[in-house]
């Protein structure tokens, strides 16, 4: 008998990335007197975040409590009002196994049901999607979603190795591939095919530092100048090579931190709180973990396109309706690719937004005006929740010195897990 033939499994069709909403056409939602009518089923009634730091001295219980306390006070509720909780982190960094049960007990959230969610860097935005679904199902009315991560207990080298496990540990990680190297592949492709330059990447970091300086909870609050990227200058600490073409200044700052988002169904939300921000649309997508299985590096991360298309369609809007956004800028190239995936710029033209400074606070589409992951910091499990907190505060007009002018009414959060393995896009409105 001959050897059995290998079955060929067709590659699944990608989520369409060219829906009208993504192209920035007209909003598809219903309107009354020219204003978009928003579907308001699930609201954010409370947000909280710890400071993002390196070398947090307390336990994960204490770290989680910082964000939880602020969110509960913000919502004006007590533990008795909460009927379920979702905890989120990247388990590679957790010494504590089954952290959801441990934290739920510490925060006074038992015997209510508690759940644990992980999707690497997008864990807490995935947790919000889970919490949203729990409420929409009718099973729960008020859900706490808490993301946390304590990353500074190990060396930077060990941290990179663990983060690399978020990619393919069988075919890629054993050969030394780590997160900077993966994103460097995208940056190389963008330079070769789209004319991206080192100055474009630097421009992203210059913007992030502009707002990191004024964000009291950011881990990196130093001003960054072009001279900091000067090659060959021993004083230019951000110019050191990491994975060509990415330099030290192109990489985000890992940190210890926590974030907390409290969700409620419409009926309960209107009773509990007067400062409501609604979830208008949620999109999520996934991609092959192995980089060799990806079809085209020149179009960036496919999950961004797919998740955005879903979220825009659900909200009945287009990219033109977004007034302020938080995107996943783990590396400078990641922010530029996010512009394109969200429809803020055509494929290959994200760099133009950097050159025109269109994503500054006073620009056409303000992005990451809290410093982003590059300056605010990236405690993996807490990142998505922190992004959501920023957008909620923006829509309430409570963002202080980071407030975008013009009273924004629709905001967006774009959160990526791994090297585009998971993608979440969530649209919020007043």
Show where each model-derived region lies.
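Short glycine/threonine-rich loop-to-helix capping motif typified by GTGT followed
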Residues: 93-102, 291-296, 329-352, 379, ...
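Short Gly/Ser/Thr- and charged-rich N-terminal loops/segments
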Residues: 20-27, 31
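Cationic, amphipathic, low-complexity segments that mediate targeting or membrane/lipid association
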Residues: 2-3
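Active-site-proximal alpha-helical scaffold in enzymes
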Residues: 118-149, 181-215, 261-268, 379-399
